[in-house]
Amino acid sequence: MDLTNYIASIKDYPKAGITFRDISPLMADGKAYSYAIREIAQYACDKDIDMVVGPEARGFIIGCPVAVELGIGFAPVRKPGKLPRDVVSADYEKEYGLDTLTMHADAIKPGQRVLIVDDLLATGGTVKATIEMIEKLGGIVAGCAFLIELEGLNGRHAIRNYDYKVLMQFPG
């Protein structure tokens, strides 16, 4: 199935010169959404994964059904102030400065094998911060999976030492 047919490209959103890749049409089509989830789960099935981790918000949309498909748990990565218990955090660079991500300090146990799932790999800042937190907790990043990679933004460089899968590529 060609999943690129289920991605809407919106020019000049959220600002001039940017083409936003909207996954809403993919999620609205049960067959395409299910296919994408199964493809990621298939990638993970031989990696002995213990936990799926996904950054907010679209990482939840993809990561949770992957975790269900694999029969394992899901741990959310959130912005500061959104998680109620003790957290670990990691800073990452955005286009106009630094931002921070957090996850519960007890979300990953030492030695657990983790699959990071998100909708988009662009510059790699989000996934790099997520990797940092997982490893700080003693987890092992067994793989990363993304619906879309924006080529030319060097996101692959951030995960060059990790196994990963991308279902679709678009110009960055």
Swiss-Prot record:
Entry GO CC: cytoplasm
MF-aspect GO terms: adenine binding; adenine phosphoribosyltransferase activity; AMP binding
Catalytic activity: AMP + diphosphate = 5-phospho-alpha-D-ribose 1-diphosphate + adenine
Chain segments annotated as coiled-coil in the UniProt record: none
Subcellular location: Cytoplasm
Entry keyword set: Cytoplasm, Glycosyltransferase, Purine salvage, Transferase
Disulphide-bonded residues: none
InterPro entries cross-referenced by the UniProt entry: Ade_phspho_trans (IPR005764), PRibTrfase_dom (IPR000836), PRTase-like (IPR029057), UPRTase/APRTase (IPR050054)
Gene Ontology process terms (BP): adenine salvage; AMP salvage; purine ribonucleoside salvage
CDD domains reported for this sequence: PRTases_typeI
Top EC class, one word: transferase
Gene3D superfamilies linked: 3.40.50.2020
Listed pathway(s): Purine metabolism; AMP biosynthesis via salvage pathway; AMP from adenine: step 1/1
Subunit and partners: Homodimer.
Function summary: Catalyzes a salvage reaction resulting in the formation of AMP, that is energically less costly than de novo synthesis.
Family affiliation: Belongs to the purine/pyrimidine phosphoribosyltransferase family.
Protein name: Adenine phosphoribosyltransferase
Native source organism of the sequence: Streptococcus pyogenes serotype M1
Upper taxonomic lineage: Bacteria, Bacillati, Bacillota, Bacilli, Lactobacillales
